[in-house]
Regions:
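Extended hydrophobic
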Residues: 216, 268-284, 396-429
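Extended, hydrophobic/aromatic-rich amphipathic alpha-helical segments that build helical scaffolds
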Residues: 88-102, 214, 411-416, 421
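Sec-dependent bacterial lipoprotein signal peptides
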Residues: 1-17
């Protein structure tokens, strides 16, 4: 069961789907427009690139492709009227911790699902040690944090081996007392709220604690200001056409400046940099009359990586979105029908069961909650991914390009030196 909420406070609008909109509409007060900056001399000079080995670059590229495939599954599974927001980075970190709880065929199938055949858990751990350190240092003007935790039933202590592996992810370990389900749920949710600066306040309900054996949780938080800030005086009330064709009036931000842009057959991709340029906000905008589903189907991750500057007239709605998806385990099985998470095997590998018996057939689920707010100042975003194990104990560069987001589109946040996606979203309603 998936839950989605669109927060109307900022009249948000970011999605992916096919709608029509008014063509060639440009409402620009040239007098108020800021001067177009030349990005060549001052763009990204303070960003700190993340240095990956050749093997880590290969892992990174493979994970990017895997992430886009998961997003496509998520989009295909959405209900009409839904907006989608996914954090590939949060999911992949959680799966990295999860992989350390596996061996044999179970591990091999997970790595295959993640597009990482030929790599080991050790390779994945080394990659994430580099990424988790590097991404926090990429831009000192951007607030970014990633935190991990491991929660386990008081009857089952993790083995020294597994506890040592989790140190690769700086995971904090906590004991769950199922006799105090309300307190345990409160502790987990307080941890989530603290690590996301209050943007996501819960990931688990009290009723889920009773049969919870363990939980692996990743939480990330991001806040960055635009390199080219939108002037609040340029924001106007303007029409947005939803995926169903309904016209809605929305607060729409406007700016004309030099941005990275690439036009493709049926859609365009633009990047809006944050602060020192280590991170970009990217948008995939279908041409008027082009169905967004067809764009998503043919979209490859390489299409998001653009390198040429153009003068672009951006019109983007302000928005605030929350999303919850409980079907991530299903999406993984769609990517690899052979994947079978043997909960008993994973449990036996990583816990000292001396003196205790438990019901077999652990049930696993993967839940992700996300949040994003976009306004004239910048972007604030958060994500939490929880892996839960339940059981019973016992173009011409001089041309101005119109890029008007007045119909459904894709969007996200990307780290530039490694092209790692932190968030990918669809806005259409």
């Amino acid at each position: 069961m998936k839950t989605k909420t669109l927060l109307i406070g900022c009249m948000a609008a970011l999605c992916m789907s096919a709608c029509t909109s008014n063509d060639n509409r440009r409402v620009i007060d040239v007098v108020q427009e800021p001067e177009i900056e030349d990005p060549v001399d001052n763009f990204r000079h303070e960003a700190q690139p993340i240095a990956l080995t050749r093997s880590q670059e290969d892992i990174n590229t493979r994970l990017q492709d895997f992430s886009l495939q998961v997003f496509k599954q998520m989009y295909a599974d959405k209900q009409a009227g839904d907006n989608v927001l996914f954090s590939p980075f949060s999911l992949n970190v959680a799966l990295g911790m999860f992989a350390n709880a596996m061996e044999g065929n179970t591990l091999a199938e997970l790595l295959k699902t993640m597009n990482l055949e030929g790599f080991t858990v050790g390779d994945l751990n080394d990659y994430y040690q580099t990424m988790l350190k590097g991404i926090k240092e990429a831009d000192d003007q951007v607030a970014f944090s990633s935190a991990n935790s491991f929660w386990y039933h008081q009857w089952f202590s993790p083995t020294e081996s597994y506890a040592e592996k989790l140190k690769n992810y700086d995971a904090e370990a906590y004991v769950i007392n199922p006799a105090s389900a309300a307190e345990a749920a409160k502790d987990i949710n307080n941890w989530v709220s603290d690590k996301t600066n209050g943007k996501i306040t819960s990931i688990i309900e009290e009723k889920q604690i009773d049969e919870l054996i363990w939980a692996l949780i990743n939480a990330i938080y991001y806040k960055g200001g635009w390199k080219h800030e939108f002037a609040e005086g340029m924001t106007i009330n303007q029409q947005f056409t939803t995926e169903s064709g309904e016209a809605k009036q929305m607060d729409t931000m406007r700016i004309t400046s030099k941005f990275l842009y690439q036009g493709y057959d049926g859609y365009g991709v633009a990047h809006l940099p944050y602060n020192d340029g280590a991170f970009d906000f990217f948008v995939v905008l279908p041409d008027n009359g082009t169905d967004i589903t067809s764009v998503i189907e043919k979209l490859s991750y390489k299409d998001l990586l653009v390198s040429d500057y153009y003068t672009v007239n951006i019109e983007m709605p302000k928005f605030e979105v929350e999303y919850k998806d409980e079907q991530l385990l299903y999406y993984l099985s769609q990517l690899n029908p052979n994947i079978t998470f043997n909960g008993d095997e994973i449990h036996m590998l990583n816990f000292d069961l001396t003196g205790h018996e438990f019901e077999a057939n652990l049930a696993l689920e993967i839940i992700q909650k996300t949040y994003m707010k976009v306004d004239e100042k910048g972007t604030e975003a958060a994500a939490v991914t929880a892996i839960l194990a339940h059981g019973a104990p016992g173009i011409d560069t001089q041309t101005i390009i119109d890029f008007h987001m007045d119909h459904p589109f894709l969007y996200g946040i990307i780290e530039n030196s490694t092209n790692t996606p932190l968030f990918i979203g669809y806005y259409g309603n």
